[in-house]
Design a protein with these regions (language model features):
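Amide-forming acyltransferase catalytic core, primarily the GNAT-like/NAT-type
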Residues: 4, 8-116, 128, 158-174
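Active-site/acyl-donor-binding loops of N-acyltransferases
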Residues: 2-24, 101, 108, 112-250
Length: 250
């Protein structure tokens, strides 16, 4: 049907023992409590945090609450010092769909607050392939780690999607400037470029690589690209960290 396993998702398993052993990481005591859809100030604060993420969904206040509780999700507001500092969309069993924080240094405290509220033994925390700040913070906290193809995706506009996620990757880590020219399924070739941290994609006359749709998905957007023969892209560009938070897939 055109959908291919793609995207990069790291998944961390976190137990109470992991958190207890890191009590020295405590920065700010946080509390977790259900969101109030009628509290406009709270909702505005949640949307501001959502919109500050490198990659995020775009919602109205009403849509945000509706999406957050889809598929039996629970929207928890994280507060510290009387202020909203983040939110967590999670199942009752501790499988987190999205955790957004004003400051990534609060990750330990946020996980403690969510675990305490839910009363569950294990939290499962997903992390986008572009989110190196989250990966650095969670490093000392997890019990197990796995890397997955995030989902099955179909890309309709390769230049736009490739440029967007190359930009997302460049925003989180240093990448070399460079240029990669591609054609997918015989469509107009395009040049994917990165210069001074800014990604772009534009039509070009010829392509260094002519790929099928399946090849393009595997090489550009999938963890499979880590083990398959690579195209000669600039170091560190591929695979591109295609990822959509699970609540945004509703």
């Amino acid at each position: 049907f055109g959908y291919e396993p793609a995207g990069l998702r790291a998944e961390y398993t976190i137990t109470p023992d992991n958190l207890r052993h890191m009590t020295a990481a405590h920065k700010l005591a946080l509390t977790a409590a259900p969101a109030d859809p009628t509290d406009t100030a709270e909702t505005a604060a949640l949307l501001a945090i959502q919109n500050s993420r490198t990659v995020h969904g775009v919602y109205t206040a009403q849509d945000f609450h509706t999406v957050a509780v889809s598929w039996d999700g629970r929207l928890l507001v994280l507060r510290g010092g009387g202020e909203v500092v983040g939110f967590c969309i999670t199942s009752d069993t501790g499988r987190i769909g999205e955790l957004a924080l004003r400051d990534e240094s609060l990750l330990y405290d946020a996980l403690c607050a969510v675990q305490q509220y839910l009363g569950c033994d294990v939290l499962t925390l997903p992390c986008a392939g572009w989110d190196t700040a989250r990966m650095q913070e969670v490093g000392p906290l997890y019990d197990r780690f796995a890397l997955f193809a995030d989902d099955k995706y179909q890309v309709f506009d390769y230049p736009a999607v490739a440029a967007f996620f190359l930009q997302a990757k460049a925003a989180q880590r240093p990448l070399p400037d460079g240029r990669l020219t591609l054609s997918v399924d015989g469509v107009q070739p395009f040049a994917l470029t990165l210069q001074n941290g800014r990604a772009d994609a534009a039509p070009c006359d010829t392509a260094d690589y002519n790929l099928t749709h399946a090849e393009a998905m595997a090489l550009l957007f999938s963890p499979e690209g880590l083990i398959r023969p690579q195209v000669a892209a600039p170091v560190g560009w591929l695979p591109l960290p295609l990822y959509v938070d699970s609540p945004d897939k509703c």
